[in-house]
């Protein structure tokens, strides 16, 4: 303790003694000083003696450390201040220096605190007086330089010392003094020191403020922990409801900042604006990272370094006042470092943070920035990073109203600590200093004004760059930035002094990076009015443009900033489209447009272009970086066996919604980020990409509407209304005109002035929306005319003024000046005239005041307005004309004005004028928005990039294309290529196809590979383009889609180029390509094909040219390019499932182009296809099958290429691939092999070349031989190929194919039957095809044998079929044997039967029925139905051969064979088939008899007969019904009605009239029977005959022929009728055969005749065979049905035979040849059969019940017959009846007497009549017997002896 005291006393004593020793002090005017010094020395001496320590005590501590605080020590130091104060006031530099030096040391070591109140000025502390005294030592520029340094040193110590506190005005005074020393001092060292000191002071002031808040927050945290101890487990919440340091410090509102603080700084500005306000308290919520938090220490160190640059050797502890200036500087540095290091008090060590991980730096800056030299009291801790509190709500609140309306101080904005007030005052002072205008004329770099401006800007920049959380978020500071700094910037941002301009830009950058969330409007103004304006205007200097673009380079490199600009401005309805304009401007610069007028040198232009490109590329890189989470790098994954991480894993890795992105990246591969956007990424409103997109669309609509309005107002308004952006009422439109500043004022005026009713309503609403209350008349008029330009027409102005006057009076009803609205109206008009008169350059003689007053006489209801009132109006208008408000947008000078800039001097002049105007506008706008709270959204979603890119892709593309096109500079080219690459990446990941394709096409175009002028011009940039294209393919393959086409086309051409470059002959397919005539092309003076192919040379060759081309292309063959190209193909395995399909699809397309080349087909891509097929075969099957779909299709085409070599290559490649693919095997139920092998089928089907076909068959045979065990679904293709080979005419092909098929069927089936089941059908089909090849009959027979062999497999292995599952899962397991086994075999056999020559088909038929008979017992019922459907196909008319002879042969051989075979099978399996098949068989037979084929019809009836006779015994009643019905149907269908109705054609053309009488109704039971009469009468509405079914075809044809006036229309009809007649006859015979057994009736007739000849009826003789017939199985009803048929047939025949006229007509028409047609046989046989049945029933004891009906029928039929016989005229006709009569008489004779009675009495008269005919002897004999019997029965006579035997029943 004593030591400390001693040191202090030593300082004081030495200093006082030194002052006293100075010779100046001895002078009289220093007597007061001298006295004070002596008194002080006395006191010190006394004090020292009093407090000397005991001798034995050790020295305590170091002498320079501040002593332990205690009251006793410290009060005294302050009371010795008076001598120093007086010393400082002396004019002697030496004394002043000594005094200052001592004060500095006392303060530094804590001996002088100045805490006591100042006795001279109440309310102040001593320290304030001390500082004032120190500052007072600076007397302006003439102050001694040593003293200047001492002042600086003392002030720095005072401001930075831990031991004293100075605030408010005192701090300002200290800063101000240093500032003034910097400006005033002539000494460079002093200037430098002053500047460094200032920086240091500011750092400390701001750091202390931040620190205090931090400490307090920590304190609060501790408090909270103490209170909520139970919450310790849970993590500390990151969002504190409000920041703690606002809680308990005495608030001081802004209004307490007294004016005097701003003393000498020339800052006599008003107090802080009253309107500094917001609705929430300022809060400390910052997102700043620890690195930035501690940035200040680093800067202190830097400041210290700056100082130490001037140091010289330090000469020990020389405290003399003769210290050299350098020593003072050194001292300051040393002491600063000591203070800084020494003061890192308790708890502030570098590793104070709990975990010590200082490296958690969010913005990517290096941790080295954190240095261990903290500012006094600045704890360096990473553990606490205050996060953003709910303050964000106020930041993005929608309170965009200007808060100027609210008067009075805002209660909200308060300082929570005096330190904040200090910082605020300093900051505000610097802003105001920077705003001071420079003197007119060219700026002088040495002038105070300019140096002050530059210094203030530098200091502001330093404050902003080191800003901590409080500064960044506290509302006071934010408002200060808005109100002072931004306004200052708007002034300095257009400075023509480069240094000022550059500093402004740097400050703007800092603001953009750290404060953008608060400065939305300000940033907009800066961009719009300064940056973009300078870029766009043609007159701005190169330097300005250069600096702006340098700044933009920084902005564009920061992803957050770029996206934020788009989201906050381009997507904001009220903001300018800054992003869009920026990109467009940069694009123009990058294209070098507009640089000519600037008079730039070429070098300057190029560097500007490069910078422009660099910015564009940076923007794209940012967009890539921003959306990188959407991108999947194909090379970081493989599709072979790996899947993408699941959604869940993804979200664990990174939550995409709120990723904080900082900075951008250096290359597309990099993931590092650096840059300026590292602050408060989350300081945002909600970031919803969809919402922003909607906003952007609305904005575009509004802009479009405004554009339209500015051309045609009505059109614009209509458009906006259609789009729903504008209401329809006049009020809505008026409001729109008020608010929308982008409308053309002239058009607004025209619209309002229009006489249209609606326009008037809008105008009234527009005026009514103004509020003129309380305004004087001229102000109101000014306000009214601000918004639009008055139209030219008087009537329009008239209407507007009238309404204005009315509204003015309405708003100001209390006024007494105007008698009525008329007065106001006239006055308004006169004011407008006055303003035109006074301010228009056209008016030469201006109106005087007197004239004006005179003009307005009597306008106030015939009275005058007061003269002084009019005079005031005149004066005001003369002073300022009435005009529209200046529009916000500065108009950029038009093109015409650009050309007029003749010289550089003129340009400068023009530019300065523009700059001045610009500064004015910018400042006005800045001030206007300084109170506006605009919500700022910090973008977080990667989705924004898509609309950004869609908006700007064209200018990007233009810039890059132009760059590549017209500039050979390598740097430009590499920037363009990088840009294009980024653009492609963005278009890719957001799958924006059009844009992606455009960029890829551009890239492809600049490779020069695809252009016709070709490779001759290839330069380095084109080579680089090729490399870029390849890189894109490599990195973005997953997204390229259709763009693969361009890329693969280039790669294909590149291969060709490489061949030329290396001089190698391309590997053409056939060595040399044959020309059309087959001669070899290529003569001496022709260029090789490949040159022609690339469009390089014409016909004749310049070999030198070729050599140079080879050289320029050489680099395309460099190893790197070749490897990179290969990598695309080998890397194809990493493409995802969709991408690989696109890749393959386009590779195939390119390959097709290569192969189709007329001059020289190439196979480069085809080989690549084979390669990638190998690489990708391991993909999951699903993907592979999609790939193969494309490749397979390509092989299909290539395999059919007319060039055989190409096809051979294709087939061979296919074979190799297939072998590899088959090796992998296949699981059950998959179909991949089938898809894979399909090209073989296609080639076989389409390619007619024997070589290729042979090769295909050999390939397949090889597969079967080597891979049979692995083949599953592939069997289908194999059989399909052999099926195609089977019909070949080339023996070797057929032979090889058949051999292999045989091998499969006999051996492979044996071993691998289950694997082949799926294609079992195909195998059978294939064999069937071999059987049908007529050229090789032996093969055919062998094939049928193999089919028989297949049947054996099915029979032996039914289980295999049952177990087999496949696509047709709807087939029940038990049916699978049928569907997959039996049915195919039988079906194919039926095909063979239908297709082959007689011997083969007969063999087929035999085998078919053999199989049925052999294996039929295993068949289910429903299988038989299917089977017979096939069998009946043999009779299918459509399948029959056309030629008549063959048809006949077919009928006689195959059909008969088949019909009988069917009967056999039916009979064999009757039990199963009767109820299943009988209907079908009957239907088939019914169908047979309807065909126009006699043979078929006969077979049908025969078959019916056979089936019934063979099986009738087993028929049920039901089946018999069916049988009868079938017979009935056939009968009815085949009655040839047309024989009766047909008429010969009366005229040549007209059809015959309908016959007036129809003998019987056309009762066609079956649709299929058609009456001629019927079909000639068209029934359909449209008068076309309805087409009847098959059997009517002839008739139908007949009709159509009648209509087409054919010569012999009847022939076809007659043929059909003839067949019907035949069938009728056959059918009668059939019924007879069925009922009585074949040949029975014939026998009976013969016997009857014989008996008659013997003249004896042997009653006892019974026919033995009677019971063989089916009679006994038929019921009486069924028999009656058959009877009805027979009798109908009989009656028809009778009718026809009786119709002589008709028969003659038919005969004449050529029906039935030589004689007249008749139906005698039908007439007689039908009746005969009927009679037999009736008599049989009559005699049948078992049918007693039916006897009565039988008798009745008999009587009717017989009497009718006899009557008819009597009418017959022709001998031959009667002859035909002989047997019939014999039968009738014989049968009647055999019945019992009782019955005979009934019959004889009935027939008696008729029989008597018969006697008159010339009958044959036999008949006569029987008649005789009859009459004799009558005699006996009726007892007319006695019976002769021999006849007594007749039974008398």
Swiss-Prot record:
Activity modulation: Inhibited by brefeldin A.
Subcellular location: Cytoplasm; Cytoplasm, Perinuclear region; Golgi apparatus; Golgi apparatus, trans-Golgi network membrane
Pfam families per record: BIG2_C, DCB, Sec7, Sec7-like_HDS, Sec7-like_HUS
UniProt superkingdom: Eukaryota
Composition skew (Basic and acidic residues), residue ranges: 46-58, 267-277
Modified residues (Phosphoserine): 52, 286, 289-290, 397, 410, 1079, 1566, 1569
Impact upon substituting residue 798 to N: In DEDISB; decreased protein abundance
Ranges spanned by the short sequence motif Nuclear localization signal (NLS), renumbered to the chain: 711-715
Recorded GO MF terms: guanyl-nucleotide exchange factor activity; myosin binding; protein kinase A regulatory subunit binding
Keywords: Autism spectrum disorder, Cytoplasm, Disease variant, Epilepsy, Golgi apparatus, Guanine-nucleotide releasing factor, Intellectual disability, Membrane, Nucleus, Phosphoprotein, Protein transport, Transport
Keyword Nucleotide-binding tagged: no
Transmembrane segments: none
Protein purpose: Promotes guanine-nucleotide exchange on ARF1 and ARF3. Promotes the activation of ARF1/ARF3 through replacement of GDP with GTP. Involved in vesicular trafficking. Required for the maintenance of Golgi structure; the function may be independent of its GEF activity. Required for the maturation of integrin beta-1 in the Golgi. Involved in the establishment and persistence of cell polarity during directed cell movement in wound healing. Proposed to act as A kinase-anchoring protein (AKAP) and may mediate crosstalk between Arf and PKA pathways.
Protein's UniProt name: Brefeldin A-inhibited guanine nucleotide-exchange protein 1
Gene: ARFGEF1
């Amino acid at each position: 303790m004593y030591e400390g005291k001693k040191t202090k006393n030593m300082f004081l004593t030495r200093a006082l003694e030194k002052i006293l020793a100075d010779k100046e002090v001895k002078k009289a005017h220093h007597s007061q000083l001298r006295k004070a010094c002596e008194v002080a020395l006395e006191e010190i001496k006394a004090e020292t003696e009093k407090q000397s320590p005991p001798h034995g005590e050790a020295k305590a501590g170091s002498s320079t450390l501040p002593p332990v605080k205690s009251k006793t020590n410290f009060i005294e130091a302050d009371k010795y201040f008076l001598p120093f104060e007086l010393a400082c006031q002396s004019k002697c530099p030496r004394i002043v220096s000594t005094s200052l030096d001592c004060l500095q040391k006392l303060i530094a070591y804590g001996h002088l605190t100045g805490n006591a109140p100042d006795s001279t000025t109440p309310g102040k502390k001593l320290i304030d007086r001390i500082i004032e005294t120190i500052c007072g030592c600076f007397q302006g520029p003439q102050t001694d330089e040593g003293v200047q340094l001492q002042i600086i040193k003392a002030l720095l110590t005072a401001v930075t010392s831990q031991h004293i506190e100075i605030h408010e005005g005192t701090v300002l005074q200290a800063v101000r003094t240093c500032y003034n020393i910097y400006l005033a001092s002539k000494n460079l060292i002093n200037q430098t020191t002053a500047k460094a000191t200032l920086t240091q002071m500011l750092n400390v002031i701001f750091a202390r403020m931040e620190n205090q808040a931090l400490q307090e927050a920590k304190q609060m945290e501790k408090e909270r922990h103490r209170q909520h101890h139970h919450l310790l487990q849970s993590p500390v919440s990151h969002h504190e409801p409000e920041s703690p340091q606002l809680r308990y410090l005495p608030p001081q509102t802004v209004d307490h900042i007294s004016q005097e603080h701003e003393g000498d700084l020339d800052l006599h500005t008003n107090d802080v604006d009253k309107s500094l306000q917001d609705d929430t308290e300022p809060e400390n919520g910052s997102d700043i990272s620890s690195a930035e938090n501690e940035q200040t220490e680093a800067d202190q160190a830097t400041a210290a370094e700056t100082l130490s640059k001037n140091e010289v050797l330090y000469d020990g502890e020389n405290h003399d006042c003769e210290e050299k200036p350098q020593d003072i500087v050194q001292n300051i540095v040393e002491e600063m470092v000591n203070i800084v290091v020494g003061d890192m008090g308790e708890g502030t060590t570098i590793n104070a943070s709990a975990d010590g991980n200082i490296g958690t730096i969010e913005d990517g800056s290096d941790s080295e920035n954190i240095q261990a030299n903290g500012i006094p009291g600045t704890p360096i801790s990473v553990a606490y990073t205050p996060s953003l509190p709910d303050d964000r709500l106020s930041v993005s609140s929608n309170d965009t109203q200007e808060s100027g309306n609210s008067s009075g101080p805002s209660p909200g904005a308060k300082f929570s600590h005096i330190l904040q007030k200090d910082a605020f005052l300093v900051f505000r002072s610097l802003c105001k200093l920077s705003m001071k205008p420079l003197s007119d004329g060219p700026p002088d770099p040495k002038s105070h004004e300019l140096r002050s401006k530059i210094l203030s800007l530098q200091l502001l920049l330093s404050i902003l760059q080191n800003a901590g959380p409080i500064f960044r978020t506290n509302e006071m500071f934010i408002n200060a930035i808005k109100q002072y700094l931004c306004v200052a910037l708007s002034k300095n941002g257009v400075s023509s002094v480069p240094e000022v301009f550059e500093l402004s830009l740097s400050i703007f950058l800092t603001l953009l990076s750290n404060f953008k969330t608060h400065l939305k409007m300000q940033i907009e103004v800066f961009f719009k009015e300064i940056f973009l304006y300078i870029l766009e205007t043609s007159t701005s200097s190169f330097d300005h443009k250069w600096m702006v673009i340098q700044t933009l380079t920084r902005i564009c490199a920061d992803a957050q900033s770029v996206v934020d600009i788009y989201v906050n401005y381009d997507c904001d309805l009220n903001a300018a489209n800054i992003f869009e304009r920026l990109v467009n401007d940069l694009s123009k610069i990058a294209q070098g447009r507009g640089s000519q007028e600037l008079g730039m040198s070429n070098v300057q232009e190029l560097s500007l272009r490069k910078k422009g490109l660099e910015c564009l590329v940076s923007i794209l890189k940012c967009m890539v970086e921003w959306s990188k989470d959407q991108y999947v790098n194909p090379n970081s994954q493989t599709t072979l066996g790996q899947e993408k991480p699941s959604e869940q894993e993804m979200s664990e890795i990174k939550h995409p919604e709120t990723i904080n992105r900082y900075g951008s990246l250096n290359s597309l591969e990099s993931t590092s980020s650096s840059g300026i956007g590292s602050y408060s990424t989350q300081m945002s409103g909600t970031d919803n990409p969809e919402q922003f997109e909607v906003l952007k669309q609305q904005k575009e609509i509004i802009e479009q509407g405004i554009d339209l309005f500015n051309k045609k107002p009505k059109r614009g308004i209509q458009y906006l209304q259609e789009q729903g952006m504008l209401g329809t009422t006049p009020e809505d439109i008026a409001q729109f005109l008020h608010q929308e500043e982008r409308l053309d004022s002239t058009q607004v005026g025209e619209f309002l002035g229009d006489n249209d009713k609606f326009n008037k309503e809008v105008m009234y609403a527009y005026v009514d929306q103004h509020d003129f209350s309380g305004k004087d008349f001229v102000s109101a008029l000014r306000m009214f005319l601000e918004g639009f330009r008055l139209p030219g027409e008087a009537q329009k102005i008239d209407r507007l003024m009238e309404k204005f006057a009315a509204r003015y009076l309405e708003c100001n009803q209390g006024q007494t000046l105007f008698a009525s609205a008329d007065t106001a109206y006239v006055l308004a008009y006169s004011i407008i005239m006055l303003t035109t008169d006074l301010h228009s350059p056209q008016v030469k003689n201006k109106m005087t005041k007197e004239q004006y007053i005179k003009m307005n006489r009597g306008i106030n209801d015939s009275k005058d307005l007061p003269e002084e009132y009019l005079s005031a109006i005149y004066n005001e208008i003369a002073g300022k004309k009435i005009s529209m408000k200046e529009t916000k947008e500065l108009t950029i000078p038009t093109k015409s004005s650009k050309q007029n800039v003749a010289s550089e001097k003129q340009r400068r002049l023009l530019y300065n004028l523009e700059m001045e105007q610009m500064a004015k506008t910018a400042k006005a706008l800045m001030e206007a928005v300084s109170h506006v709270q605009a919500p700022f959204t910090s973008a977080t979603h990667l989705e924004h990039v898509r609309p950004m890119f869609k908006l700007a892709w064209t200018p990007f593309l233009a810039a890059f294309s132009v760059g590549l096109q017209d500039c050979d500079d390598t740097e430009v080219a590499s920037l363009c290529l990088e840009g294009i690459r980024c653009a492609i990446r963005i278009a890719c990941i957001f799958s924006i196809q059009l844009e992606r394709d455009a960029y890829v096409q551009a890239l492809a175009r600049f490779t020069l590979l695809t252009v016709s002028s070709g490779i001759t011009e290839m330069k380095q940039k084109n080579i680089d383009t090729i490399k870029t294209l390849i890189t894109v393919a490599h990195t973005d393959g997953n997204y390229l889609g259709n763009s693969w086409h361009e890329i693969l086309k280039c790669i294909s051409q590149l291969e060709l180029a490489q061949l030329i470059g290396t001089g190698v002959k391309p590997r053409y397919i056939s060595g040399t390509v044959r020309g059309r005539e087959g001669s070899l092309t290529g003569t001496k003076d022709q260029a090789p094909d490949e040159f022609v192919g690339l469009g390089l040379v014409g016909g004749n060759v310049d070999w030198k040219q070729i050599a140079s081309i080879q050289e320029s292309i050489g680099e395309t063959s460099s190893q790197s390019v070749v490897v990179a190209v290969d990598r695309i193909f080998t890397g194809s395995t990493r493409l995802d499932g969709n991408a690989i399909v696109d890749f393959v699809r386009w590779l195939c397309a390119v390959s097709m182009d290569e192969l189709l080349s007329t001059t020289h087909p190439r196979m480069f891509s085809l080989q690549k296809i084979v390669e990638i097929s190998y690489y990708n075969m391991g993909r999951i099957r699903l993907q592979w099958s999609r790939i193969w779909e494309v490749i397979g299709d390509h092989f299909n085409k290539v395999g059919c290429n007319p060039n055989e070599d190409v096809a051979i290559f294709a087939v061979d490649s296919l074979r190799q691939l297939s072998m590899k693919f088959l090796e992998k095997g296949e699981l059950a139920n998959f179909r991949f092999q089938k898809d894979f092998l399909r090209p073989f089928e296609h080639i076989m089907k389409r390619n007619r070349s024997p070589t290729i076909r042979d090769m295909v068959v050999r390939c397949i045979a090889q597969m079967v031989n080597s891979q049979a065990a692995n083949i599953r679904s592939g069997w289908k293709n194999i059989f399909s190929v052999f099926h195609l080979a089977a019909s070949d005419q080339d023996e070797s092909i057929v032979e090889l194919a058949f051999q292999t098929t045989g091998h499969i069927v006999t051996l492979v089936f044996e071993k691998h039957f289950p694997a082949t089941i799926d294609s079992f059908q195909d195998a059978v089909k294939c064999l069937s095809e071999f059987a049908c090849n007529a050229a090789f009959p032996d093969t055919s027979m062998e094939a049928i044998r193999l089919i028989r062999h297949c049947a054996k497999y099915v029979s032996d292995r039914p289980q295999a079929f049952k177990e087999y599952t496949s696509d047709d899962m709807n087939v029940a397991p038990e049916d699978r044997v049928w569907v997959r086994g039996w049915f195919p075999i039988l079906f194919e056999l039926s095909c063979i039967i239908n297709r082959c020559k007689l011997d083969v088909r007969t063999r087929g038929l035999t085998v078919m029925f053999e199989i049925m008979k052999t294996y039929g017992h295993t068949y289910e019922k429903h299988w038989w139905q299917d089977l017979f459907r096939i069998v009946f196909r043999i009779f299918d008319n459509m399948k029959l051969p056309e030629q008549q002879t063959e048809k006949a042969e077919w009928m006689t051989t195959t059909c008969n064979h088949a019909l009988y075979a069917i009967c056999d099978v039916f009979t064999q399996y009757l039990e199963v088939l009767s109820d299943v098949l009988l209907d079908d068989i009957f239907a088939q037979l019914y169908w047979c008899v309807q065909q126009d084929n006699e043979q078929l019809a006969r077979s049908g009836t025969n078959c019916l007969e056979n089936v019934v006779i063979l099986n009738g015994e087993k028929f049920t009643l039901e089946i018999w019904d069916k049988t009868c019905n079938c017979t009935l149907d056939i009968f009815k269908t085949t009655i040839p009605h047309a024989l009766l109705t047909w008429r010969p054609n009366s005229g040549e053309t007209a059809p015959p009239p309908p016959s007036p009488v129809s003998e019987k109704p056309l009762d066609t039971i079956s649709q299929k029977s058609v009456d001629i009469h019927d079909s000639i009468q068209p029934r359909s509405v449209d008068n076309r005959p309805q087409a009847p079914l098959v059997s009517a075809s002839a008739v139908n044809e007949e009709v159509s022929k009648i209509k087409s006036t054919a010569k012999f229309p009847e022939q076809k009809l007659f043929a059909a009728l003839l067949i019907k007649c035949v069938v009728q006859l056959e059918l009668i015979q059939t019924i007879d055969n069925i009922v009585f057994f074949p040949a029975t009736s014939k026998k009976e007739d013969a016997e009857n005749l014989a008996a008659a000849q013997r003249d004896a009826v042997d009653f006892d003789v019974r026919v033995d065979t009677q019971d063989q017939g089916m009679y006994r199985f038929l019921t009486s009803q069924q028999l009656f049905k058959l009877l009805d048929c027979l009798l109908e047939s009989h009656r028809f025949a009778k009718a026809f035979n009786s119709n002589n006229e008709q028969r003659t007509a038919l005969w004449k028409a050529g029906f039935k040849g030589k004689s007249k047609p008749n139906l005698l046989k039908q007439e007689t046989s039908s009746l005969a059969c009927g009679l037999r049945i009736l008599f049989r029933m009559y005699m049948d004891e078992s049918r007693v019940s039916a006897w009565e009906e039988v008798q009745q029928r008999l009587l009717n039929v017989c009497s009718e017959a006899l009557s008819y016989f009597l009418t017959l005229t022709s001998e031959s006709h009667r002859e035909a009846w002989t047997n019939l009569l014999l039968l009738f008489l014989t049968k009647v004779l055999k019945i019992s007497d009782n019955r005979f009675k009934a019959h004889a009495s009935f027939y008696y008269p008729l029989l008597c009549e018969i006697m008159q005919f010339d009958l044959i002897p036999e008949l006569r004999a029987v008649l005789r017997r009859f009459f004799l019997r009558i005699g006996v029965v009726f007892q007319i006579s006695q019976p002769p002896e021999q006849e007594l035997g007749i039974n008398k029943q």
